C-alpha cells in the first residue's frame, strides 16, 4: 500500500513539473510577441520572415 502511495506522489510531482514548464514557455512566447509588436517588427516583411511563429 505504501508503494502505491509513493507512485501516486511521484506521478503527481512529474505532471505538476511538466505543466509548469509548459506554462513558462507560453509566457515567454507571449512576451516575445508583445516585444516584437511594440517595436513594429510584425509590420515589416523581413522581420515577419525571421519570426513567422510570432508574427503569424
From Swiss-Prot:
UniProt subcellular location: Secreted
Residues of the propeptide: 17-39
Main location: secreted
Keyword field: Acetylcholine receptor inhibiting toxin, Amidation, Disulfide bond, Hydroxylation, Neurotoxin, Postsynaptic neurotoxin, Secreted, Signal, Toxin
Pfam assignment, any one: Toxin_8
Effect ascribed to mutating residue 49 to L: 10-fold increase in ability to inhibit rat alpha-7/CHRNA7, and no change in ability to inhibit L.stagnalis soluble acetylcholine receptor (tested without hydroxyproline)
CC annotations in GO: extracellular region; host cell postsynaptic membrane
Stretches for region Ser-Xaa-Pro motif, crucial for potent interaction with nAChR: 43-45
UniProt KW Lyase keyword: no
Signal peptide residue numbers: 1-16
Family: Belongs to the conotoxin A superfamily.
Function noted in UniProt: Alpha-conotoxins act on postsynaptic membranes, they bind to the nicotinic acetylcholine receptors (nAChR) and thus inhibit them. This toxin inhibits rat alpha-3-beta-2/CHRNA3-CHRNB2 (IC(50)=3.5 nM), rat alpha-7/CHRNA7 (IC(50)=392 nM) nAChR, and the L.stagnalis soluble acetylcholine receptor (all tested without hydroxyproline).
Domain notes: The cysteine framework is I (CC-C-C). Alpha4/7 pattern.
Record-given protein name: Alpha-conotoxin TxIA
Amino acid at each position: 500500500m505504501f508503494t502505491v502511495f509513493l507512485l501516486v506522489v511521484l506521478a503527481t510531482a512529474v505532471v505538476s513539473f511538466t505543466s509548469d514548464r509548459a506554462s513558462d514557455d507560453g509566457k515567454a512566447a507571449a512576451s516575445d510577441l508583445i516585444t516584437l509588436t511594440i517595436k513594429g517588427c510584425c509590420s515589416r516583411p523581413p522581420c515577419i520572415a525571421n519570426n513567422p511563429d510570432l508574427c503569424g
